[in-house]
Amino acid sequence: MAAPGPNKDNIRAGCKRCGYPGHLTFECRNFLRVDPRKDIVLDVSSTSTEESDEEEQEALSKEKIFGSHSKGSQEDSRKEKHKKKSKERSRGKAKKRSYSSSDEEEDEMSKKKKKRKSNKKKGKKEKREKERKHKKKQKKKDTESSSSDSSSESSDTD
């Protein structure tokens, strides 16, 4: 006998507005509030973006002909325009993001490779210089020690 109320087995976290489990209610972008004081909500996901401005004008002219100038029809037309604008904005943002992110990643990778190559070259140069300096110091020590040895030998023979 399962209880009809919510329990841990049948609760699924998701959006209460559109029912999609991929996001929570406060993250929902499928519905827009037209007026925060009223409880009017727009469903963005149901609008089609393929309608042109001409089709909108035809629909408005038909409404004028039939004489349906109630507040509801005006609000509906406003809502549709608002939906289309918001959808166009979101589509434009998505295109920019996808375009720029891939290019930036490629640029970053090439920059990193260049930095690594330059760092390797610098490291090799520094090693060579250190080896040269070390060899010079050893030669000086050898020459100093040999000259001191020869001077001591010459003093012994005199």
UniProtKB/Swiss-Prot annotation:
Q: Where is the composition biased (Basic and acidic residues)?
A: 59-79
Composition skew (Low complexity), residue ranges: 145-158
User: Which UniProt keyword terms apply here?
Assistant: Metal-binding, mRNA processing, mRNA splicing, Zinc, Zinc-finger
Cite a single GO BP annotation. mRNA processing
User: Do you know which PROSITE patterns this protein is assigned to?
Assistant: ZF_CCHC
One MF annotation (Gene Ontology) recorded for this entry: zinc ion binding
Function, in words = Possible splicing regulator involved in the control of cellular survival.
The name under which this protein is listed is Protein SREK1IP1
Species whose genome carries this gene: Danio rerio
In the UniProt record, what gene is named as encoding this protein? srek1ip1
